Amino acid sequence: MKHFYIILISLMGMASYGQTTKGVVVDEFGNTIENAYIVNSNTDSHAHTNELGMFSVDKSQVGNVLKVSALGYKKLNFTVNSSEVSIVLEGDIFRLDEIVIQQQLSALNVISKIDLETTPVNSSQEILRKVPGLFIGQHAGGGKAEQIFLRGFDIDHGTDIAISVDGMPVNMVSHAHGQGYADLHFVIPETVEKIDFGKGAYYASKGDFATAGYVAFQTKEKLDKSSISVEAGQFNSLRTVGLFNLLGNQKKQAAYIATEYILTDGPFDSPQNFNRVNLLGKYSAILNDNSKFSVSASRFSSTWDASGQIPQRLVDNGTISRFGAVDDTEGGKTSRTNFNASLSKPIDENTFLKANAFYSKYDFELYSNFTFFLEDPVNGDQIKQKEDRSIYGMNAELNKKVKMSDWDASFQLGVGFRADATIDTELSHTLNRSIILENIKLGDIDETNMFTYLNTELKFGKLMINPAVRLDYFKFNYKDKLASVYKSQSETEVKVSPKLNFIYSQNNNLQFFVKSGIGFHSNDTRVVVENNGKQILPSSIGADVGTIWKPFPKLIVNSALWYLYLEQEFVYVGDAGIIEPSGKTKRMGADLGLRYQLNDWLYFDTDATYTYARSIDEVKGQDYIPLAPDFTTTGGLSFQNWNGFSGGLRYRYLKNRPANEDNSIVAKGYFVTDMNVSYEYKSVTFGVSVENLLNTEWNETQFATESRLKDETNSVEEIHFTPGTPFFMKAKIAYKF
């Protein structure tokens, strides 16, 4: 290990090889362009711009011609006139044939860029659906974080997927409702600039919860124009959005304010009374040394009522409709306030530092009743889950590239921490939201995660080898406020997560990859201290083998075979306040996706996933993993700027899947289609969108639950579900200025 660090330090200090042209690529407004592709037509040497738009091309000199291309920009032949250049690209229509498959671990991110360009998001739910193979479901009146499904995982609300926005974590550790709870509703969809995602645990910069994968959202640095829009639709639905550019199109600085307000009663017999308010302010600047600095503040709050999950037997016998309720006093309220500052600083043409620091204030209060009168035949089983949380944190990463005669290397050294302080994390048995019948759990939680990682990319021509390692330190502390005497419990744990990936790029149109790595998700502090720190950071061990292929200029295909093993663990059940074991599991599957541009304005995309998911230690036939997706597919046609018209037709299909361990109860699948169309005339856009175009009867979320109704003697275990949205039409008008 000592010799390794000596070699590393030596490499990072070496000078570039041969003559070099270095520079930056920007658009007409001065915004830096990431992942632009630069090729020296005289020597065939090439490079990509980094996050700051900077590049360095070796074997290049004055008089050479650089061919520069980037998705969404016109190609440019640039004649080198000095050793340092600034290249300006002009915006253009989206062209799939301009895509270059890059020799990097996150090469698949080009898929999300394509999808954002061709099918822009207009709801917070659609943001997560941009990740191929990821399904979501809402089952609490619109205010609760979505239930997530990916790679054979019922991720619940985020246990096995790490989600972040501008470097701020979205997942909540030791949350009152469930571990990893990730409420993304504070993001205004129109402000999303980039979606970075990866499946599996192969990324050193991603730690806690990144077992099935990660999703990292990046908001816009600036707005081209200001705009206001109003949407109105069925079920007393209203949404207004305001985007206000405060500084115009200055090249060195930008500032904007974004607002969103949503009201709806939903299709339910008992109105949801849902409302949500979002506010975001962001300032960005390019400093004299080409550093990029930004600071943002946001506020989100939401309240709602919910009909809850209903038992199939009541719908079958006609007692209630699919949109009825057993206990319509469910619901809740939540809020989140964020402050975030980030800096990307170039040190030289091959080195830069990026860092961000953040603070979040979060409140949550949820009322649920999943079992009705099973535990309390008189008052019912309603529960309250509540918490008041503060989150502090920082991420920093040093990036260094080294160019040798016949191979290149790059290094990312990262450090950071996250500290959560939660006051009065509560689970109580309640009546009609107003009376606390029993405090089941009540306490304060302090949890700290400090980490470091080293990621290395060694490029030998067409082959890139990517060894990496991550080190995480956790400290858990719980103060039980229901104990008769003062009781504060604490545990610490260290986790080492190695990764090893291979990427072979045959050319700019064909890439093969083998990825492998160990990841983990943390467990609730209440599990950690009660289980004396044992089996609290279960490992996931996984591998992917796949390709990214561009057989034709306007067609890109991605495919992968994968395997994932998850260790046994003990988990905290937030709805019951108990700890139960979760056995070892294995998942394997296949992913396939394609993107095709039929002409300048018409696009087609589809993704399909197959998964085989089983518990390892259970006997055959009793080893199904409840709600694990088996087969899924999504896709659609979209068109952009065809004589002023834009729109699309999309579908999503989720196959029937087991709802319990022996598959005796089945969660029914669904096939749902959505449609939207808009027309832009000068500065005004008119649009119509329809969810569930064919008015399909489907269950958005469903569980095998044992419950008892007030007039029942015995309990019944069966499907309890939240119905999916029926035919739902909205109209929209927007004005840009």
Model-identified regions with their sequence ranges:
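Face-selective signature of the C-terminal outer-membrane beta-barrel domain
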Residues: 286-301, 332-481, 505, 509, ...
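Short acidic/polar hinge/loop motifs at secondary-structure boundaries
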Residues: 55-58, 169-199, 218
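C-terminal beta-signal and adjacent terminal beta-strands/loops
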Residues: 604, 656-657, 679-737
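Membrane-embedded beta-barrel scaffold of Gram-negative outer-membrane proteins
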Residues: 344-346, 352-370, 505, 511-519, ...
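Gram-negative outer-membrane beta-barrel transporters
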Residues: 399, 405-406, 474, 562-565, ...
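Short strand-turn segments of transmembrane beta-barrel domains in outer membranes
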Residues: 197-204, 213-247, 259, 267, ...
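Extracytoplasmic beta-strand/coil segments of soluble accessory domains associated
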Residues: 125-172
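Transmembrane beta-barrel wall of Gram-negative outer-membrane proteins
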Residues: 234-263, 268-307, 331-348, 405, ...
